[in-house]
Structures are given as C-alpha cells and as structure tokens.
Amino acid sequence: MTPEEFLDQARRGDLAPLDQDRAALADAVRAFARVGDAASALELAARTWRTWLSHGELDAGSSAMAAALTAPGAETVPVWRARTLYADGLFAFRSGDRRRSWERNQEALTFARTTNDARGECDALTGLARIALRDGEYGEVIELAMQARERARAAGDLEAEASPLHLQAAGVRLQGQFHAARELYMESLDLNNALGNAARLPTEQHNLGWVELHLGNIDAAERRFRERDTHAGADAYGDAWSDINWSAVASARGQWEEAKRRFALGMHGLESLRIALDPDDQSEVDWLSSRLAAVEC
C-alpha cells in the first residue's frame, strides 16, 4: 500500500488491515513527513495510534508520533497536531516518562485552546488528569476531568466526554468512594455503548469488577470479569490483567493457592509488556499483593 492508501484506509475507520502491518504503517507516516506533508503525517498518526497501544508497542508508537510531530510545518496543522501530541503523551505515560507526558499534554492544551479545538482541549485535560492520578492528586484528577466534561458538553461532543468521564471515575475510586465510582463507571459504560466504542467496554468491565470486589459483591465482580474476558485478544494490557482479576476473585473466596498461582501468571504477563501500570491498576496490585503476603505470614 502507498502512504496515500494507508491514509484513505484510516479515514474510512477500517484499521484492522493496518493493524496487521504496523511497521509499514509507521513507514507511511515517515514517508509523508519526509516529503514535507505534515498534515497527512499527523492525520495518519492521529487516526491510527491505538494500533500500537493495543499491542503494547510503546517505542514503535512513540517513534511514529515523533516522526509526524517533527515534520516540517507540523506546528501549523490544526486538529491533527493536538491529537498526535495527546497520543504521544499517552505513550510517554505508559512508558513511565512523566515529564514528556506532561509536556506533550500541556502543549496540546495550549494549541487546542489557540485553535478553538474542543476535542483537543478535552483530550489534553484528560492527559493531565491521568498524570495527576499517578501523582496521587485525586482531587486535581476530578477537577481536570470535570473541566473536560463541561467543555465537551458545551461543544455538544459526546465522544470528547468519554475519556474524562473514565478519569473522573478513577479519581473517585482511588479516594475510596466505591459506590460513587460504580455509578460513574456505569455512566461511562453506557456512554461508550451509545457511541459504539466497543474497544473501551472491556476496560470499564474490568474496573467495575474491581469496584464490586471492594464493595464485597463477589458474584457481581465475577460477572464483570467474565464479560471482560469475552473481548480477549483486543488489548495486550487488558489481557495480561485477566489472571490478576481472577486471582482477586479467588482470594475473596479464600482460595489462596489458586489466587497465588493466577497472580504470578498475571504479573509475569504484565512485566513482559514493560508498561508502567495505570495508577488505579497499581493500587489494586498493591492491595492484592498485600492480601496474598498476609496469608503467607
């Protein structure tokens, strides 16, 4: 496929063929950048970055984003530059590079506000909220997420509200407000269902499963985790969590040997991805690890 054909495919929203040859996709981004077509390089990168993220290929994704962002004239391209800055900020976040993630999201926020790009502004606020979550500043997480949701509603852009709603739920959850977090995650699940965002549904089923566990609803947690597992294969990070999810269920039922076995399998899977855990997930690993360690003592 030529770079132009890659871009046409991305515009149609059919990313499955592109997902099969991510190296060629990255080459297409670089080809546009080399000839000075920054607009096409940024658009292709912005439309396809999730193909690398879903496979846990952080270095490859970051490299493709960097190629687009450093193309001659990239600083003048509205919309797609903000989207690509946000994407690279997320790659940096997952890699544990807080500084680069903050810089990318801050730059995206400034650029989006300058160009009156509501979606870009919401994305950037979400990225900054994600960093605050890792910093343990849960009040700031909720504040930034609510700002983004209000901006999305003012613009009439439901799609732009989806990510900050997820971050608001995470902030509330890490404050220990599990009933309120459940309501927000349910709202997020309903919104993504309405928008047809199938890729985001397993994430919220996963989160709801953990909230139900903390509320003592083991059967409900099992249902959520089982529903998440029906989407196995779509996201390397989420799939690696499956064993840890079931370890938590086993521990809640007092099945300690099974819990330890599944926990070891899950942690091996996560470590093989070389990804910095999302803060809400890290808190659950710490919680479950402490429970399992207490049994051994």
Indicate where each model-derived feature is located.
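C-terminal non-catalytic interaction modules
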Residues: 256-297
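Solenoidal tandem-repeat scaffolds enriched in leucines and small polar residues
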Residues: 150-164, 170-176, 180, 190-192
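Tandem amphipathic alpha-helical repeat scaffolds
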Residues: 8-10, 42-55, 82-96, 120-137, ...
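Amphipathic alpha-helical segments of tetratricopeptide repeats
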Residues: 29-30, 69-70, 106-117, 146-157, ...
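Alpha-helix C-terminal capping/termination sites
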Residues: 14, 18-21, 33-34, 54, ...
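Short, well-ordered secondary-structure microsegments
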Residues: 2-75, 80-85
